[in-house]
Amino acid sequence: MGEPTALAERALEQVPDLDAAIDELATPSRVLSRVARPRPRPQEGPLESMMDVAAGGASAPPADPERVLEDGRRAAMKVRASADPQHVTLTLDEQVGLEAVILLFGRPALLVQHGTFPTPPAGWEALDAERPRIEHSIRSVGRIELLNRGMVGTGFLVAPDLVMTNRHVAEVFSLPADGGGWTFKLGRTPVIDYIDERDAITSATYKITAVAGIHTDVRIDLALLRVEANPIGVVPAGWTTPAVLPVSGTPPVIGDGEHHVYVVGYPATDNQGVTPPDVMMRIFGDVYEVKRLQPGTMTAISATLPRFSHDCSTLGGNSGSCVVDLQTHQVIGLHFSGGYRESNYAVALWKLADDPLLRDAGVQFV
């Protein structure tokens, strides 16, 4: 098998009791609603090819989840037991099942409900240990949408009246104004809702009043939006405006091992058809545009550009999401690009600590 089984070995290496972990996690509902596609490092492409096999094309009959997971259990045990995992021989069914098992222990995309997240999959117990601080971050991330038009992206609070998002998100509803600055397009009324969770019956919506600035450097996909201090409409009982997220003004301290981060955002369905429909359904359970916690690792920091890459599970709709350091819970990045068969990229915000646009707008670096 070569690289696919090597990737599987790496994905499963943090799971000491593999058989028990599969028994605990491998139910169809959990596969669909609690985990998402793992994001391999840029040079590790075989997992995507395995997913193509699993998708099976538009005419493929739906797979039996129990059979797929049993095939995956058998394949995972073969990989675990082999002295040479890269040369393990697997049947086609075992290859498909192995991908499903990897998803259980790979990069999850956990649904946020009532401001918190479910028990994470095996290998991500660190999220539970950091739960209170992660929940604090979750509250300050919202879904940017247009009244009567739907979602356009994600944003997060970086000052009491300031939301950060991507340039390409802001440009959906704004355009350059005569004499400088930016103005809203006719008929576009942007707002941000800090809840928008699955099955939520309440909202916490704030009007976006102005574009404070859009970065002129084409390498920096960043925009800043002014928001009103008080919500519009009815909010949940006891609701208070979310806290400002601390933005790191210094580089993350990278040790010898993986450097864990997490994204909070609103992944949306792939309307461009890049991701096979069967893959989207199997991984996300047809649940999109709601708040999710998406942990992963930093994979590279550019030496020449103000950006870094990460392997959190993201889709369209995550544009404008914060990338938070799991050690410090400070925002280190602004996610701006990524998806099926792509690397994930974020603006390295610590490199902009002295940037005039961010400084003058009031971004609070720490």
Model-derived regions: residue spans:
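Protease-domain processing segments flanking chymotrypsin-fold serine proteases, especially trypsin-like
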Residues: 1-153, 290-297
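Serine endopeptidase catalytic core focused on the charge-relay Asp
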Residues: 121, 132-152, 156-316, 324-327, ...
